[in-house]
């Protein structure tokens, strides 16, 4: 079943975060992931939630998503993300076809 990583991002260093985005994309692709949402307009419809930025990644399954998160190619970009933004991240399983 497909799996989705959903990330809420509060950017604290915009210049550094742009570099992170440049480095993160190839690692996502190497693990079969693709960006479903990468920033863009975000509007709160219910509740008290006002994210600055949302990213949604799709992977083949939950295991593959975790492999990407912990892969050597993403180690340095991941550290960069931690330095340039405050993030909250969840992994959810999608529906089968």
Regions found by a protein language model. Give the residues of each.
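Short S/T/G/P-rich N-terminal loop/turn motif that feeds into the first structured element of a domain
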Residues: 1-54, 58-70, 93-97
């Amino acid at each position: 079943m497909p799996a989705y990583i959903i990330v809420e991002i509060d950017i604290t260093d915009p210049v550094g975060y742009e570099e992170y985005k440049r480095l993160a994309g190839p690692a996502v692709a190497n693990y079969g992931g693709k960006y479903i949402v990468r920033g863009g307009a975000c509007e709160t419809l219910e509740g008290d939630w006002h994210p600055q930025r949302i990213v949604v990644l799709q992977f083949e399954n939950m295991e593959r998503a975790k492999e990407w998160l912990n892969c050597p190619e993403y180690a340095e970009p991941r550290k960069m993300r931690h330095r340039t933004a405050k993030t909250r991240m969840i992994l959810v399983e999608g529906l089968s076809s």
